[in-house]
Regions:
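Aromatic (Trp/Tyr) and acidic
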Residues: 180-193
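Aromatic-lined, polymer-binding surfaces characteristic
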Residues: 1-170, 177-178
Length: 193
């Protein structure tokens, strides 16, 4: 019953949509019909309706199109939301998935040639956590990931994480990474290595 999912900071919308979509999928059989309707309505009005306009009018600095972690995180959230309510809004889902697949390479092209994330280890983890969710969801629901996993460097990205971890187990402090503690290896990425 939130008024909105904080569209001013679209990462919040993406994370909320991801959580709600996964919960809706996992709990569908035990949700009351009224709760299902609320979830479908919320995903559509608080996330997907907003992204349609962003794809249409957003410039290169738009979260949907930029070359940073925001692109993968936000587009993944929208794809998961679209897949969750696809049976109710198939054309909307098709449009969102198509646009997300079109723009996600804007970020991932920077993984070429050897999987390095220019934003540093912390954002590597954030980006790849969502990338692994995206690849799994696309493959499970649509039977393909539209070539995203085949982009140059994506298959080597796990090596970047391994090489940016020091012998002490701590992440080297560079780029946008200041964590003194190691981050756990993103669980989904080894499947794509």
């Amino acid at each position: 019953n939130y008024q909105d999912w904080d569209p001013v900071h679209y990462l919040d919308v993406a994370e909320m949509t991801t959580a709600v979509a996964i919960g809706y999928d996992w709990l569908y059989d035990v949700l009351a019909p009224s709760t299902r309707q609320l979830v479908v309505h919320s995903i559509k009005t608080k996330a997907l309706d907003l992204v349609v306009e962003e794809y249409k009018t957003g410039n290169a600095d738009s979260w949907a199109k930029r070359e940073t972690n925001w692109n993968v995180v936000c587009n993944t959230g929208m794809v998961l939301g679209a897949l969750a309510i696809e049976e109710h809004y198939p054309e909307l889902a098709k449009h969102i998935i198509g646009e997300a697949v079109r723009y996600i390479p804007n970020c991932l092209k920077h993984f070429a040639p050897d999987g390095v994330c220019y934003e540093g280890p912390a954002y590597w983890g954030y980006t790849n956590m969502y990338l692994s969710l995206l690849l799994k969801a696309l493959n499970d629901n649509l039977g393909e990931d539209f070539g995203i996993s085949e982009m140059v460097g994506v298959d080597k990205s796990v090596l970047y994480y391994m090489h940016s971890t020091s012998p002490s187990g701590k992440i080297f402090n560079f780029a946008n990474s200041g964590s003194p503690s190691p981050k756990p290896l993103c669980p989904g990425i080894p499947a794509y290595n």
